[in-house]
Amino acid sequence: MQFGLILPIQAQGVDLDRLWQELRAETAAAEAAGFDAVFLTEFHQARGGALVSPMLLGAALLQGTDRIRFGTAVLAAPLHHPVRVAEDLLMLDWISRGRVILGLGIGHQRQDFAAFGVPHAERAEVFE
């Protein structure tokens, strides 16, 4: 059995520098406690703000760790070009020495789809 943690990315009322330090500390603590992975979600129009690039943030969080894996929980696939996702995943997998878990989904935040110009009603079709 393996265990992972979903890290909080919503920054409502929190200084972003402080949130970054907390995420780094939580990742280090998770690794020290024996957790297998940490996960980040993807929200672009979250109330109060959010950290919006889970793969980029995950790459930074893995620096300074040796064993723990990073995963997306989940990346809203219809909002991204599949080649870009594949390339970013390939690079992240390489620099992390194979410690990446890709979680994909159709997404659900209507405001995110509006911001990206992707019709919310077509998200399942775009995902396939």
What does each model-found stretch correspond to?
Residues M1-T65, R69:
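N-terminal beta1-alpha1-beta2 module of alpha/beta enzyme domains
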Residues Q2-R18, L79-E128:
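Flexible, glycine-rich active-site loops centered on histidine and acidic residues
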Residues T41, A73, G103-G105:
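Structural motif
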Residues G64, R69, A73, G107-R110, ...:
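A generic, residue-level signal for flexible/boundary positions that often mark functional hotspots
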Residues T72-H80:
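Active-site nucleophile and cofactor-binding loops and adjacent substrate-binding regions
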